[in-house]
A protein has these predicted regions:
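Short, Lys/Arg-enriched anionic-surface-contact patches
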Residues: 3-23
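Short acidic DE-rich linear segments
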Residues: 70-78
Length: 78
């Protein structure tokens, strides 16, 4: 599986548009912006690393899908 490439701005916009839970939003921002690892994130937010992994997995496809959609439709706006 290839790693999906995105900019920090793309990740920020996708997170803001898709994720409504503030705690999940904060975790995803730290993960996608700072490339934070699971254990430090779990410690920072007082949850288990498995829970952090589940949160990331829950939103990954939606975030990547939003970024791809945005890229495809950005051209039509200009």
């Amino acid at each position: 599986m290839r790693h999906f490439k995105y900019t920090k701005d793309e990740a920020e916009e996708a997170i803001d548009q898709i994720v409504h839970d503030e705690k999940h939003r904060a975790i995803l921002r730290r993960r996608y912006h700072d490339k934070a690892l699971l254990e430090p994130l779990a410690e920072e937010f007082g949850i288990e690393p498995r829970t952090v992994s589940d949160i990331i997995a829950k939103y990954r496809a939606d975030l990547e899908g939003f970024i791809k959609w945005r890229r495809n439709h950005q051209e039509s706006f200009y």
